[in-house]
């Protein structure tokens, strides 16, 4: 676990931004930056009014397990979105039992809980969260499941929540585009069976 120093020199916005960006999947950079400046661990970058994000929150919304696990080991807090992304069902249940309204909460950039849970590969967790009220973000949840090859989650979403198969992510790709780019023909065939087309 990182020992945060007593250094009182303020962190710069550039330091924080660089670390948070690294948190979106660049484990090597996260390790190096944190070794050089341990106070970055829970520092939040403000992207805009009301849109703040720490490195672990970045890891959670892109499904970067390695980065999230590393940051947790260094002492970052295990929040609901991260627990859902990692498939830590007992933690998710405990957090929701303590605050039932959190089922409607959103992570960084306003991304809904279901989208984080889709990365877990745990269809039962996704179904339970949806049943409990986490009904926003169905389409992005499918895209996230496809991005990590979480077939069981993709099947559940396709069968139960009618995601928009024409929706495109920030790269302009549909879920089918992502499956094809990954070389996941089984997933691509599943999506085509539900009417998906490439963009």
Predicted regions and their residues:
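Ligand-binding grooves and catalytic loops that recognize ribose/phosphate and carbohydrate rings
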Residues: 107, 112-113, 119-128, 132
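Ankyrin repeat structural motif
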Residues: 26-34, 64-72, 88-96, 122-130, ...
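Ankyrin-repeat boundary/"N-cap" motif
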Residues: 9-21, 42-58, 77-84, 105-116, ...
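The conserved C-terminal loop/turn that links adjacent ankyrin repeats
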Residues: 39-42, 77, 101-102, 133-135, ...
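Ankyrin-repeat-protein effector appendages
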Residues: 2-20, 69-82, 98, 131-132, ...
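N-terminal segments that cap or nucleate solenoid repeat domains
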Residues: 5-48, 87-105
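Ankyrin repeat A-helix N-terminal signature
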Residues: 20-26, 54-64, 82-88, 116-122, ...
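Ankyrin-repeat and related helical/solenoid repeat scaffolds used for protein-protein interactions
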Residues: 139-182
């Amino acid at each position: 676990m990182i020992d945060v120093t007593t250094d009182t020199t303020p962190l710069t916005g550039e330091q924080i931004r660089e670390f948070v960006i690294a948190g979106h999947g660049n484990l090597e950079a996260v390790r190096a930056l944190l070794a050089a400046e341990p106070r970055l661990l829970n520092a939040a970058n403000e992207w805009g009014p009301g849109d703040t994000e720490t490195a672990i929150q970045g890891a959670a919304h892109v499904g970067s397990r390695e980065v999230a696990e590393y940051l947790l080991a260094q002492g970052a807090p295990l929040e609901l979105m991260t627990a859902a992304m990692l498939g830590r069902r007992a933690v998710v249940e405990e957090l929701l039992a303590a605050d039932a309204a959190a089922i409607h909460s959103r992570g960084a950039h306003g991304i809904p809980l279901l989208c984080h849970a889709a990365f877990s590969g745990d269809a039962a967790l996704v179904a339970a969260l949806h049943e409990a009220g986490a009904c926003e973000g169905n389409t992005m949840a499918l895209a996230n499941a496809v991005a990590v090859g979480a077939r069981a989650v993709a099947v559940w979403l396709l069968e139960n929540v009618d995601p928009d198969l024409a929706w495109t992510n920030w790269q302009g790709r549909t879920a089918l585009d992502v499956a094809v780019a990954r070389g996941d023909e089984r997933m691509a065939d599943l999506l085509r069976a539900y009417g998906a087309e490439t963009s």
